[in-house]
């Protein structure tokens, strides 16, 4: 085996994947995670590093013979042995890829949204956290059902599927999955504990203790962490004004390059896009401030604060409320897959967020579900028809404008925004919801 070097920062859960895989395959791998070999935030921004790894992200792997790999799952696949990849069984190989993709798409995003605020890495958002909890419940439910008659995810031995999902669930189990939360998912916890106690896992992770009490957002910890990130930006302009107090004209352009330097490639690409025409430019200014309502909805109680605010400030002359129902319920199978339809639509409609709000709900169970939602748009036309940027997935739904003063509209807004109520028009129980804001 040629071996190679893995660049990362200490305790990077993504780096655990290739490191555990290397324990099983006996692949010789050197870890560079501290000076002078590697310092995160400095080394990964140098021209030499970016030439090898253009995104500047870690973990990143450089083989002893000079080739380079990025993305933790790809690195783990490379350093693994055939058994971890699914042996010579094509079905097992496909199933390993399936669970690795499942981990990246369905576990990591909600896990990050829930756990990061408890670590002081991210600001707390009540609505995002509650939504993440519901998504994690769905994920754990899928895994629990699959593991009911299985020791491991694929076949009879540990594979990259087990390694990847264990690493993705690691911080959940360490920070927030307290006993009462994880109790309904006993098969998952049994499997997780089995994995982390394997010698190859313990060599990388050490002893893993499951949390006793769900960690909460710590404002003090967040305040301590955040200034460290901002320090480089503050130091540059602080020095320049002292030298250029009398030169007012030259002082203003000096800091200009800094924001551009801070943009990653995707942000630069977005900044370079031509500006689209505003479909609502012809409408008079509205007194209803959508962003303010979204703040209320995200951070305050829905029934006692957000909804009263909505109806107090909603301007029916400049805004409209629509009911949408998915046209093809007979095609909906697994509930987590149905939720992907909603999430995918939301992601592709990012340019509509500024002037819209929606609560879309999945009702029912596996192979017997429906999707419907309530949307709020600027103006009185169906928003999707007004811009090419917005013409995404909306034709898969039937749309009906609601009369904002009607009892039907008031009831629907209350039930869909609060995710609770009788939902008499649906005839199925609430499963889970998604918010577009």
From Swiss-Prot:
GO terms for biological process: translational elongation. Residues 276-437 form the EF-1-gamma C-terminal domain. One of its GO terms (molecular function) is translation elongation factor activity. Keywords: Elongation factor, Protein biosynthesis. Residues 89-222 form the GST C-terminal domain. PROSITE patterns: EF1G_C (PS50040), GST_CTER (PS50405), GST_NTER (PS50404). SUPFAM superfamilies: eEF1-gamma domain, GST C-terminal domain-like, Thioredoxin-like. The keyword Transmembrane helix does not apply. Probably plays a role in anchoring the complex to other cellular components. Residues 2-87 form the GST N-terminal domain. InterPro entries: EF-GSTs, EF1B_G_C, EF1B_G_C_sf, Glutathione-S-Trfase_C-like, Glutathione-S-Trfase_C_sf, Glutathione_S-Trfase, Glutathione_S-Trfase_N, GST_C. Residues 241-251 have a biased composition (Basic residues). Pfam families: EF1G (PF00647), GST_C (PF00043), GST_N (PF02798). Residues 225-279 are annotated as: Disordered. This is Elongation factor 1-gamma-B. GO terms for cellular component: cytoplasm; nucleus. EF-1 is composed of four subunits: alpha, beta, delta, and gamma. PANTHER family: ELONGATION FACTOR 1-GAMMA (PTHR43986:SF1). The keyword Protein biosynthesis applies.
């Amino acid at each position: 085996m040629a071996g190679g070097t893995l660049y990362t920062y200490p305790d990077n859960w993504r780096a655990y994947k290739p490191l555990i895989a290397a324990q099983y395959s006996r692949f010789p791998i050197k870890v560079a995670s501290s000076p002078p070999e590697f310092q995160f935030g400095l080394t990964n921004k140098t021209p030499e590093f970016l030439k090898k790894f253009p995104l500047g992200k870690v973990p990143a792997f450089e083989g002893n013979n000079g080739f380079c790999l990025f993305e933790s799952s790809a690195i783990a696949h490379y350093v693994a042995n055939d058994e971890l990849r699914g042996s010579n069984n094509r079905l097992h190989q496909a199933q390993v890829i399936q669970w690795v993709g499942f981990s990246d798409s369905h576990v990591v995003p909600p896990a990050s949204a829930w756990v990061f605020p408890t670590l002081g890495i991210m600001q707390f958002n009540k609505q995002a956290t509650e939504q993440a909890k519901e998504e994690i419940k769905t994920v754990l439910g899928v895994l629990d059902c699959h593991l009911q008659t299985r020791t491991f995810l694929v076949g009879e031995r540990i594979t990259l599927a087990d390694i990847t999902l264990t690493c993705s669930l690691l911080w959940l189990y360490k920070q927030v999955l307290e006993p009462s939360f994880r109790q309904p998912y006993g098969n998952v916890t049994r499997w997780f504990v089995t994995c982390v106690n394997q010698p190859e896992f313990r060599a990388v992770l050490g002893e893993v203790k499951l949390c006793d009490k769900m960690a909460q957002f710590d404002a003090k910890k967040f305040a301590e962490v955040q200034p460290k990130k901002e320090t480089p930006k503050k130091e540059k302009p602080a020095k320049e004004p002292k030298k250029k107090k009398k030169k007012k004209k030259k002082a203003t352009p000096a800091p200009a390059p800094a924001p551009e330097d801070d943009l990653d490639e995707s942000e630069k690409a977005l900044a370079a896009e031509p500006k689209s025409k505003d479909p609502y430019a012809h409408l008079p200014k509205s007194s209803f401030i959508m962003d303010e309502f979204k703040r209320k909805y995200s951070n305050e109680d829905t029934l006692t604060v957000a909804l009263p605010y909505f109806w107090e400030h909603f301007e029916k002359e400049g805004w409209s409320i629509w009911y949408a129902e998915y046209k093809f319920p007979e095609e909906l199978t697994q509930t987590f897959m149905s939720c992907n339809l909603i999430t995918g639509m939301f992601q592709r409609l990012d340019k509509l967020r500024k002037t819209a709000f929606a609560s879309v709900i999945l009702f029912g169970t596996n192979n017997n579900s429906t999707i419907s939602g309530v949307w709020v748009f600027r103006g009185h036309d169906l928003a999707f028809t007004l811009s090419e940027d917005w013409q995404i997935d909306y034709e898969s739904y039937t749309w009906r404008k609601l009369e904002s003063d009607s009892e039907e509209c008031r009831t629907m807004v209350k039930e869909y925004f609060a995710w609770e109520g009788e939902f008499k028009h649906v005839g199925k129980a609430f499963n889970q919801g998604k918010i577009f804001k």
